[in-house]
Regions:
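Structural preference for solvent-exposed beta-strand-turn elements
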Residues: 1-402
Length: 402
């Protein structure tokens, strides 16, 4: 079997396929080349049977039908070293060994021992049984995954069911038990989707490589198969843990008007937290926010001092919101509060864990707006956002510290 391909075209395929390449001394560390009739060649890789990719190599000339393998790390290194503007020949003998050469230079030949391609994980069966669930723009999926990622738990020992984001009932959601986020879009209707935190980087790389395309989502009970319009296929296993049911009132919090609402410049808020934390115990993450309803001054943030002799206090300037600039969330939260009737107990003083707040802020622009409400003895900070480019509404919630 023989493959003749331009260096840039082989490199483009390997750049995607190497995202699911393993490092063990077995087939998981090899690329598998599949040659079919009519110059149809794909390159596959699968890490620990959990991740899979299949990428067309095109344009290409091929001879023979069958499969051969090449150690992935060495092949990528060789292709990068050969550089653009050259043509690469790969030829497999009847023992599976592969010779790589640069066309026009007969002395430049590299030999690689191959493995049995039949030991490659059986993703073909999973793919053939998968049913098409939905086709979504890659940019929409990318925006949603980047927005939800800070809320996915990374503690897979105590709460593995929370180490994933899911789409169900028209909403994407995630929680680490202390904060949560929900994204709502008509595009999510009738879609059942689960992605584990450890798969976010590879899925996002796949989406980035196909950012102008629509992505088909095919599903089985065990896996999701993403198919791009150029024929590239990416597979990953679904978590077998059931995501917990979120309280119904949180799922319907998009229309809430919190009891109190504040707007800040993101830099001002983060700088205040950084300053306070520099003078507190390294294991202390609790900040007290204080701004009574009748206050004529800016809100204050307070932390216990490292010396425990006094408290550290920092004032955070409020941002002035012009109604003409607040027609969309998050700034619209301020106007909604001003136009709504005030009722209930004031929520102007509470304690929060700044680690969770900083995770939320990592996904926001320079305008930070949040409201607070209280239910019995429990309170929470509520954030709203809107992705107009994709018609997506988002709410996120950070629990107060009791």
């Amino acid at each position: 079997m023989k493959v003749v391909v331009a260096q840039k075209d082989l490199k483009a395929a390997l750049d995607i396929a190497q995202n699911t390449l393993g490092s063990s001394a077995d087939i998981s560390s090899h690329f598998v080349f599949d040659l079919q009739d009519n110059n149809q060649v794909t390159v596959m890789s699968s890490e620990s049977k959990r991740l899979y990719s299949c990428v067309p190599v095109s344009p290409v000339k091929s001879t023979g039908v069958g499969k051969f393998t090449v150690e992935g790390k060495r092949l990528v290194q060789a292709v990068n070293a050969i550089g653009d503007g050259h043509t690469i020949n790969m030829e497999s003998d009847d023992k599976g060994n592969v010779a790589l050469s640069r066309e026009g230079n007969s002395k430049s030949k590299l030999n690689y021992p191959g493995l049995d391609p039949d030991t490659f994980p059986d993703w073909a069966t999973e793919i053939s049984s998968a049913k098409l669930s939905k086709a979504l723009p890659a940019k929409l999926l990318t925006a949603c995954l980047n927005a939800i990622k800070p809320y996915v738990s990374d503690d897979d020992t105590k709460r593995p069911e929370l180490c994933q984001a899911v789409i169900r009932d028209g909403k994407m959601m995630a929680t680490d038990a202390y904060s949560l986020a929900i994204l709502r879009s008509n595009e999510f209707a009738d879609l059942d989707f689960k992605i584990q935190l450890k798969d976010f980087p590879n899925v996002l790389k796949f989406l980035k490589a196909h950012e102008t395309q629509d992505i088909e989502i095919h599903s089985t009970a065990k896996a999701h198969i993403l198919k791009a319009q150029d024929g590239t296929t990416f597979g990953f296993m679904r978590s077998q843990h059931n995501f917990q049911n979120l309280p119904a009132h949180f799922l319907n919090s998009f229309d809430w008007t919190p009891r109190r609402v504040w707007a800040f410049n993101k830099g001002d808020l983060l700088n205040s937290i950084e300053l306070l934390s520099s003078g507190s115990d390294k294991n202390d993450f609790f900040v007290t926010f204080n701004h009574p309803e009748d206050a004529l001054t800016n809100p204050t943030l307070t932390m216990d001092s490292l010396t425990e002799r006094d408290s550290l206090v920092e004032e955070v300037p409020l941002m002035v919101v012009n109604p003409a600039d607040a027609t969309q969330y998050p700034l619209k939260m301020v106007i909604d509060r001003q136009n709504a009737e005030v009722s209930g107990v004031d929520t102007g003083s509470f304690k929060f864990n700044y680690k969770y707040l900083k995770e939320v802020l990592s996904g926001l622009d320079n305008n930070v707006v949040f409201g607070c409400s209280k239910e019995g003895s429990k309170g929470f900070m509520l954030f709203k956002n809107r992705f107009d480019d994709h018609d997506i509404d988002m709410v996120s919630i950070v629990a107060w510290v009791s």
